[in-house]
Amino acid sequence: MMSNLIILPMLLPFVCALILVFTKNKNRISKILSITTMIVNTMISIALLIYVVNHKPITLDFGGWKAPFGIQFLGDSLSLLMVSVSSFVVTLIMAYGFGRGEKRVNRFHLPTFILLLTVGVIGSFLTSDLFNLYVMFEIMLLASFVLVTLGQSVEQLRAAIVYVVLNILGSWLLLLGIGMLYKTVGTLNFSHLAMRLNHMENNQTITMISLVFLVAFSSKAALVIFMWLPKAYAVLNTELAALFAALMTKVGAYALIRFFTLLFDHHPSVTHTLLVFMACITMIIGAFGVIAYKDIKKIAAYQVILSIGFIILGLGSHTISGVNGAIFYLANDIIVKTLLFFVIGSLVYMSGYRNYQYLSGLAKREPFFGVAFVVVIFAIGGVPPFSGFPGKVLIFQGAITNGNYIGLALMIVTSLIAMYSLFRVMFIMYFGDADGEQVQFRPLPIYRKGLLSVLVVVVLAMGIAAPVVLKVTEDATNLNMKEDVFQKNVNTHLKEVNHK
C-alpha cells in the first residue's frame, strides 16, 4: 500500500497543472486549487518520510516489471526529505505570488508552469533510474525556460538565452554520460548500477564517465558553471526568483550527492578531490559576488552560488560526517534561500529600488524586517542555534577528517563574507542616509508578512529541533554511502552482480 503512495507527490501537481489549463481567467479557482494541491502534497510527503525513517525505503515498480527492467521510483530518507521540503516551499511561494489578487495571475498559465516545474523537481528526487532522471530534468527545464522568459523584456530575454544555452549543453552532457554508462555497465537502475560498479573498482573508463556526470550536474547546480544564474535570478519577480533559488540548483546538488556516494565513490582521489576543488572555486566566486554589487537581487543570487560551494565541500570530503552535513545543509538551504528571496523581494516591493543604498530608514518603519533579516543572516552564517549551524559543523568535521584545511578555512572566511554582505544592507536599513531623493515606502501586505513569519519560525525550528532532522539525514547518509546497507533495504531481489 505505501509503495503505491510514492507516486502521489508527483502525480498531484501534474493533475492540478492539467486542470489549470482549463481554468484560464478564473483567478480564484486557480489560487485555491494550486495552493490546496501543494498543501496536500506536503502532508503526504512528510507522512511518507516519517514512515521511511521508521521502517525502510519504499519502491514502486510500474507495470509489474521489477528493477532493473522496469521504471522504478524510490522513496528513501534522502529523496523524501527533499520532496517534503520542496513541496512546503512551493506552497508558500504560490501563496506569496498569487495572493496579489491580480487578474494577470493566470497570464501564460503561470501557475501551470510552476506546477510542471515542481513535477520535474519531485520526479528527479524520486526516480530510481538514470534515463527517467534525464526525462524529469527535461520537464523541469522546459517549464523553467517558459518561466524565465515570461516578462518578455529585453533584459529577461538576454538572461534567458544564457540560461537556456548552458542548460541545454548540460542536458546533452547528461545524455552522453547515460549512454556511455549503459554501454559500459549494461544497466541504468541505481541499485543495479551500485552493485555492478562495486565490482569494477579502479576502472579508468568508469572514472572518465563519472567526470562527464560531474560536469553535467555542475551546470545544473551552478558549481563553478554559474554564468546563467545571477542574470536569470535578477530579472525574475520575487516568487519566481525564490522558486528558482530554492529548487533549481538544489536538484543538481542532490544528483551530485546521490551519484558520488552511491555510484561513483570507487576513485575518490580523482572524483572527490575534484569536487573539493570545484567547491572551493565556487565559494570564492560567491564571496566576490556578494560584496561586488549594490543590487540586492544580485547579492541574493550570489548567496545561492556560495551555498552550493558549502554543500559540495561536504560531499567532497567523502566522509560520513561531511556527507551528512551536506544533506542537512541542502535541505536547510532550500528553506533559507526561500526566506532570503522573500525578504529581498519585499524590500524591492516596498522601496521600488534594488540598490540597497535607497533602503535607509525602512527597518525603523517595519521592525519585523529587522527580525527576519537577522534570522536570514545568522542562518546563512551558521551561527548557533540557527538552522545553518548543524550542517556547517558536520561539514567542518568532514573537512578536518579528510585533512582539507584549505577548504575549511575558505568556508569559514566566505561564511563571514556572506554575513557581512547582508549586514551592510541591514545597517543601511537602520542607520543609513538615503542616497539622493527621500524614498517613500509602501506598506507590505499582511499576508506576505504572514508568509515571512512562517518561514522565520521554520528556520528557527530547524535549528532548535536539529536532532530530529539529523536522524533523517544520518539515515540517508548511511543508506547511500554503504552499498551493502542500500542493497539490504532496496531491491533485495537483485542478487546477480556479475557484469555480463
Curated annotation (Swiss-Prot):
It is found in: Cell membrane. The keyword Ion transport applies. Keywords: Antiport, Cell membrane, Ion transport, Membrane, Transmembrane, Transmembrane helix, Transport. GO terms for cellular component: plasma membrane. The chain crosses the membrane at residues 2-22, 32-52, 78-98, 108-128, 130-150, 161-181, 209-229, 240-260, 273-293, 308-328, 330-350, 368-388, 403-423, 450-470. It is a multi-pass membrane protein. It comes from the Bacteria. One of its GO terms (biological process) is ATP synthesis coupled electron transport. GO terms for molecular function: antiporter activity; NADH dehydrogenase (ubiquinone) activity. The keyword Ribosomal protein does not apply. Belongs to the CPA3 antiporters (TC 2.A.63) subunit D family. May form a heterooligomeric complex that consists of seven subunits: mnhA2, mnhB2, mnhC2, mnhD2, mnhE2, mnhF2 and mnhG2. This is Putative antiporter subunit mnhD2. It comes from Staphylococcus epidermidis (strain ATCC 12228 / FDA PCI 1200). The gene is mnhD2.
